[in-house]
Amino acid sequence: MPHQIVLEYDPEIDRYSAVCPDLPGCASAGVTEAETRLNIEQAIHLFLETA
């Protein structure tokens, strides 16, 4: 089942962050949008694996 993610860019630190609102505490970050998307997908997988 796909999960919604919220992706944000912070120009002050030149980094992206992502959270999954459906999974409390599931968050990640990265230098590029692509890296951040990959990181949050891995975080979601790990979150569900340990739930």
Question: Model-found features: residue ranges?
Answer:
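A short, exposed loop/beta-hairpin motif centered on an aromatic-Gly-Thr core
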Residues: 24-35
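Generic detector of low-complexity/intrinsically disordered segments
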Residues: 9, 25, 48-50
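N-terminal segment of the canonical double-stranded RNA-binding domain
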Residues: 1-14, 19, 23, 38
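Extended rod-forming repeat segments used as scaffolds/tethers
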Residues: 15-17, 29, 46
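A short N-terminal helical cap/helix-turn-helix that marks the beginning
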Residues: 38-51
